Regions:
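Thiolate-centered catalytic microenvironments shared by cysteine-dependent enzyme domains
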Residues: 1-83
Length: 83
């Protein structure tokens, strides 16, 4: 599975594509993006991307879930099946 995260700001757009296992879940709602991923490496990449783009992210380590807030900036997530 591939997760594409895009942050749209006034002067620039930042996009990151992450290759994940098939057991990864990504749920997009109006207020948050919830990514449930077991890999520490993938979680750290997502957290560093959010830190770079200054988007708030909450981590729930017991359930391996990251929650990205969509309120301050335009944050989009899209998933693709890896073939």
């Amino acid at each position: 599975m591939i997760i594409r995260l895009t942050v749209v700001c006034t002067r620039y757009n930042v996009t990151m594509e992450i290759l994940c296992h098939k057991d990864t879940e990504c749920v997009v709602s109006d207020e948050t993006i919830e990514i449930k991923v077991a890999s520490d490496k993938v979680r750290n990449k997502i957290k560093e991307f959010c830190r770079f783009t200054r988007v708030s992210v909450k981590e729930y380590p017991l359930v391996h879930k990251l929650v990205i807030s969509r309120e301050s900036k335009k944050v989009f997530a899209k998933t693709f099946n890896n073939r």
